[in-house]
């Protein structure tokens, strides 16, 4: 009797493959990320807080009335009709400097008002330090100026000149009744 031997060749199982996939992204200080979004949220809250505090204390109204009617510009403005080297020399300017000045945050302040025909709006710069970045935040507050509102001198004191009595104030009288104009003060802030 013959015996037959059968040999079976088993193949070894294939080794598992491991693939590594890498994705690289450069992150700069101004890249959108969770931390930069957090910084923007803080700047937004700070801008809103400055405006709210200034409105509550009356400093915001005093700041929009801090107008040199003979020079047709804000008092002590460094260039043109507005400030370029720092905030206005008043309580609102002090608040802006406290909140933004020491943190490396640049800001512009604009005052938007109704134009003479009552339908269009115009914008007066109060503080302008440059073009905002793409990550700039904006906050605004409206100040309703009455016909009885009085311009402020360079020390912040009342001049005795009502806005309704001068033609040299940047915003014209467009409302009927006791309201002179509604001024929207906007702070635009960004990290430098």
For the regions a language model picked out, list residue spans one by one.
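N-terminal single-pass transmembrane signal-anchor helix
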Residues: 1-22
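N-terminal export/assembly leader peptides and their processing motifs that target proteins to secretory
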Residues: 22-192
């Amino acid at each position: 009797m013959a015996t037959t031997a059968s040999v079976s060749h088993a193949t070894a199982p294939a080794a598992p493959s491991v693939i590594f996939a890498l994705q690289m992204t450069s992150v700069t200080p101004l890249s959108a990320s969770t931390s930069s979004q957090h910084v923007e949220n803080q700047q937004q809250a700070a801008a809103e807080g400055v405006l709210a505090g200034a409105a509550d204390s009356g400093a915001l109204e005093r700041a929009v009335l801090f107008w040199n009617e003979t020079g047709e510009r804000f008092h002590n403005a460094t260039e043109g009709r507005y400030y370029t080297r720092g905030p206005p020399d008043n309580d609102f300017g002090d608040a802006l400097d406290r909140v933004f000045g020491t943190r490396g945050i640049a800001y512009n302040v604009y005052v938007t008002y109704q134009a003479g025909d009552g339908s269009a709006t115009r914008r007066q710069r109060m503080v302008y330090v440059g073009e905002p970045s793409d990550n700039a935040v904006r906050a605004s507050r409206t100040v309703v100026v009455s016909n009885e509102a009085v311009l402020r001198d360079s020390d912040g004191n009342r001049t005795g000149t009502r806005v309704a009595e001068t033609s040299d104030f940047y915003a014209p009288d467009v409302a009927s009744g006791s309201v002179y104009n509604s001024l929207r003060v906007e702070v635009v802030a960004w990290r430098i």
